[in-house]
Structure formats: C-alpha cells, structure tokens
Amino acid sequence: MLRKIDCVMLPVPDLTSATEFYTRVFGLLPLWRDEMSVGMGMPDTDAEVVLHTMDLPVDQSVHYLVDDVPDSVAMAQQAGCYVRRAPFEVVIGMCAVLEDPYGNPVCLLDMSKGQRTS
C-alpha cells in the first residue's frame, strides 16, 4: 500500500528566510510555492521537504504516497488502524491521517488530481 515517502513537512516562522536557508545550507531547490508553504526538491529523489507556516500537529510530518487514499484507509482500518482524520481534499488529491495500533501517526496522500508543479 505505501509506495514511498512523498514529503516531510517542516514548520517554519518565515517562508522566505527558510527557503533561502535550506537552499544555501542544504542545497535544496524550490519546486513550488503558495501563501503557506514551499516545496523543496532534493537531487536524488522526488520526495520533497515542504516548509510551511500552517498550524499542523508536529507528529504528522511524514506523508506517504498511496494509489488511493479512501481505499487505503478502508484496508488499514480493517487491519486495526484508527482514523484520526477521514479522507479530505488537498491540492494534489486526497489526504487522511491514520494511527497504527502502537499510537504512531500514518499520513497518507494520493495524487488523484495530479502532481503539483507551481
């Protein structure tokens, strides 16, 4: 079900200074930007570091790509996962937040609307 790590979400107080810092220090390059986040690319993977100013739980920073969020949620729920947040729409498709039987968050994304480019 989990295909890959799609992104790691990092909270920052200022997108402009954080973008400059992650470019200068870590060699990441901006891929896209909106008013609350910037997707930063790494040279050897298509996974992104997403710098953001949103009020999100810090334990939900890693997002896994799946083929279909609603189907994946149903399968995981049958296997014993708890649904912290039911599937909801995001720019690229659908997202949901599960909790495994050990208390760990499992954030799922699909790209049913297509990959973000700007």
Task: Please state what every model-predicted region is.
Residues 7-9, 39, 50, 61-63, ...:
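Short aromatic/hydrophobic contact patches that present stacked aromatics
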Residues 21, 70-75:
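Short amphipathic alpha-helices within nucleic acid-binding modules
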Residues 27-33, 82-87:
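Short secondary-structure junctions
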Residues 17, 34-38, 91, 115-116:
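Short glycine/proline-centered loop/turn elements that form peptide/ligand docking sites
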Residues 73, 78-118:
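Vicinal oxygen chelate
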Residues 1-19, 46-47, 60-62, 112-118:
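N-terminal beta-strand motif that seeds the catalytic metal site of vicinal oxygen chelate
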Residues 28-60, 105-111:
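Conserved short beta-strand elements that form part of the metal-binding/catalytic scaffold
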Residues 2-4, 54-59, 89-90:
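Short glycine-enriched loop/turn motifs at secondary-structure junctions
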